[in-house]
Amino acid sequence: MPMSLGNAFIKNFLGKAPDWYKVAIISFLIINPIVFFFVDPFVAGWLLVVEFIFTLAMALKCYPLQPGGLLAIEAIAIGMTSPEQVKHELVANIEVLLLLVFMVAGIYFMKQLLLFIFTKILLGIRSKAILSLAFCFAAAFLSAFLDALTVIAVVISVAVGFYSIYHKVASGKGVSSDHDHTQDDHLAELTRDDLENYRAFLRSLLMHAGVGTALGGVTTMVGEPQNLIIADQASWLFGEFLIRMAPVTLPVFVCGLLTCFAVEKLKVFGYGAELPDNVRHILVEFDKEERKARTNQDVAKLWIQGLIAVWLIVGLALHLAAVGLIGLSVIILATAFTGVIEEHSLGKAFEEALPFTALLAVFFSIVAVIIDQELFKPVIDAVLAVEDKGTQLAMFYVANGLLSMVSDNVFVGTVYINEVKTALVEGIITRDQFDLLAVAINTGTNLPSVATPNGQAAFLFLLTSALAPLIRLSYGKMVIMALPYTIVLALVGLFGIVFLLEPMTTWFYDAGWIAHHVGEATHAVSGGH
């Protein structure tokens, strides 16, 4: 019997998502305007934030762009925020958007070099704990100079490469033949167990790398977008930023690496999976075949990609241009010198990041609601009202950490630094206290936010990437795997803020490493940013 038109509409709405999920989204869309108009806009705002987090948490059931987008469109339509405010948010975050559009595509054209390097690392280090440390440390080191999203894009690209090599061979095909690695139909039972273990192995490496980006990203002014904003407001340069953060970031970095080693050794929280022998064998064979089949043309490509990698690191570390523009230069150089000149070959590079870029635009419209409905105002006012300076530092760190878990850490950091700047200009706090608070804000937004994927853009990118469903990495799984790190990073960071920050900063002043700033810093950034 053919389906009625009404049923067809219902069936088409959100496609293959479960029925309960469709009902949930429709009920959100019905409830929100009622709460906004008849109860309280403030409550409606928080309700929207919770609903959006729900769509992120269910990313494996349905990509969050559609349900989150519907919620955002309705929020704008009923007046929770305006299209102008959304545009303002997008303009303020144009660097992040450019980065996603161009840099991630640029990394796609560096794939051969990345696979070459990481295959050597993966096969060269036998101990899983040492390998995890290597991934975590490498991600941290790179994130101190590059953007965390760029680093995660590199790691994702490598992991997809490793996954597809094994999946192809396990499905009974040759290494070089075409293959769809999203389908598990052709796998024998024996290889399914290996595949599950391999997925767990890749999951743990990706999470170590993800946390590594947070460990490294907090230390320097170029590590995360909000660091740049905070450094700009405080008039700190690269060296001063590094030194001022050190009392908190160094202990956190050491404890983060110790946590990485511990969870692997103890095999807890979903860590500890080893690389199955069959998979290692396939990867070794793949490496041998690649070496044999490598022509001079391939070697030339690797050299070119190596040179471009040097340009990438130098360009980003010295901030020679906006990150996205450096990404665009990578696309142009890599394609021109490796002979990729057809339009359809270029198109594939953009497939990975554009859905996420669209999702991020929706995310910024939710941020616009947070600004227009002043959802964070009660928290900010309460913290600024605390009299005792030491307590105020700790409170700032905690409040920042909690808000960063729900919202984008760029947004939270920006809102806080603006409020503190206003307090400085109005003479409520001294310049030295402002500098200490800036450290508390930076570490508060960067460290505890590893708790959930919405806190760290790099985690959100990983969760919504094409790789996440392949290795069965869900929102819940990420939260659980991040838990030991969340606890250690948040507590050690708090310890640093409470016990180390003031005495160490005084010592830095006395040693002449940093100088006292006089008067207020740059004027507060306009609007929400």
From Swiss-Prot:
Signal peptide: none annotated. It comes from the Bacteria. InterPro entries: Na+/H+_antiporter_NhaB. It is found in: Cell inner membrane. It is a multi-pass membrane protein. It catalyses: 2 Na(+)(in) + 3 H(+)(out) = 2 Na(+)(out) + 3 H(+)(in). Belongs to the NhaB Na(+)/H(+) (TC 2.A.34) antiporter family. Na(+)/H(+) antiporter that extrudes sodium in exchange for external protons. This is Na(+)/H(+) antiporter NhaB. It comes from Vibrio vulnificus (strain YJ016). The lineage of its organism: Bacteria, Pseudomonadati, Pseudomonadota, Gammaproteobacteria, Vibrionales. The gene is nhaB.
